[in-house]
């Protein structure tokens, strides 16, 4: 007859902790990662399936490098998390079979492999968030006609947020190396607190980026209509949905994770949401690019996204009336053209007044 499990180890060696939670967590993570693989494959296909306009090539190369970075870091995290879960399960099963509880104590207090894997997870998740912020902020900055008063505050907020995340990751790595002392345990709790602040700050920053981007699209559309330029309401609504549905995924995932972790009252959740949050950080910006590219390759929208057809300012001066057709993928160009057209009209009005005075 097997001896009963000591009470202090019962939570670690329960069926839910040692069997159900690892299986459900890995299943959920690989389901989301499988979707990410399909999304990344769609991006690679659409990115190289047709030649981009010359003016968009620098941005295209930037987004390509950032998207590759996001996917590589997400893959590193998936591998590290898998090693962590499998190694922990092996230790738990070995302890249950041999009743060698010293093995469990050594794993929990000072296991070098566990420390390396945990550190790799924390660092890759923060670096992935940095790359995601870079991509989203750059797109927001371009859509806002490269205005520094929009880009600089977002960059500063992102730097502060990710610096907090790096500090939390370093503190947790130091604490996990040896948790046998009270000081190490206190240090680990400090790292957890900083990490919670990092997640909340990241949710706020990404929400601001999403709202600014969607707001600028709406404003540009209104300006286009006010200047008598024809545009597709359906296309604008689609782009707004793209921004809101994909850009807002990351802060929503963070908020849900924080709610689940802090409302379980010691009861383990159905699965660990931490890897889901990390993967969504890569999926959200990638989905924006992919959905925009897929939309630009469908039917009659291809010409609208590929080209910007507009009337030159000289044609206005000669009294010719033509229709402006803008691509939502070139919002900053459309905005600059609207502003330039307004300046031309103002100058023409001033010249007319001077002619009348003479």
Regions found by a protein language model. Give the residues of each.
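Intrinsic-disorder signature of cytosolic C-terminal tails immediately following the last transmembrane helix
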Residues: 1-358
